[in-house]
Amino acid sequence: MSNYDFLKPRKRKKSLFVVEGEHEKDVLVYLLLKVFPEIDIAEEDVVIFRSNIYSLYDAIEKEYGEDWDEIGVDLVYLMNKQGRYEFDFEDVNFNNIVLMFDYERQDPKFSEEKLCRMQRYFSDSTDVGKLFINYPMVEAYQDFSGWPDASFEQVEVTCDFHIVQEYKVRVKDTMVAKMVDLPNVIGRTLKNRYHMSQIERRSRCTEALLQLRPEEVTEVVLTSVLSHFMSEEKVKSARYQMLSLLKLSEHWKENLTYYEYMRLLFKDIIKHNIYKACSIVGGSYQVESSMLHGKYFDLNLLEVLECQNEMCRKVKKGMIKVLNTGVFFVTDYNISLIG
């Protein structure tokens, strides 16, 4: 019997994300919520656990005992007790709970049994929560050499600790990574070159620039936008600097706003990761558009994990297929968002 049966059941109305680190919250989830505004999730409901999945497992076992998956786990209660998320227990209700963590086979606490237990238990975001594991890490969604990238099906990385550390550095040079980083590049330029020290002002200026459609941009338009945030003297230099940054971006070449382009890009990223997950469990990477929805709902993330474990277990060539399942929270929320 659970020690928490006396607690009144909560009517679930909100969404809660439990993620491993800053990149998941401040970059990936933030951007996905931005480009898919149909997803009704508040940024403040994304909780950074600040440790890996094995530490979360230990916290669950400490709170609920070895038979935690038979007793039942209340993640909202656990996050609140650990001081990760503060709310009025009686008033805040959740209808969607998502966990997003890295595979991290190189961790000293790594255990296939523990991972499989977690994946098996956390399988429903509308109930106890749904676990999305990224292989080898969250940055896997950036691992595309160009777009489209037919080679993604074969992209893999060794399970060796040092190579995994190098992986994060390698993906920083990809097209997707550069697109994701564009708002930061603009923000840093505004701060360092034009001394825009106030974070809120810098953020609003960056946002205004990213909302511009290339065909509408003239010297007059750029001057008008920038003049809201800096002196006339700085505008003269900044408009050329900002225009040069924007022109180098992929969205500019496609005559789209930044967020229009990123929405299309993430739709394709999600689809390619669905294709790859299907191929990992023995299916075909080539999935017809008309069959995509059915293939996704037939996908078993525990089976994906077991296949990845088996590949990594090989002594001579322990490899793991690069895969980001974290982006699947979009399709879980509403698969029609990806077309």
What positions do the PLM features span?
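Extended charged low-complexity segments that act as oligomerization/scaffolding linkers
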Residues: 46-72
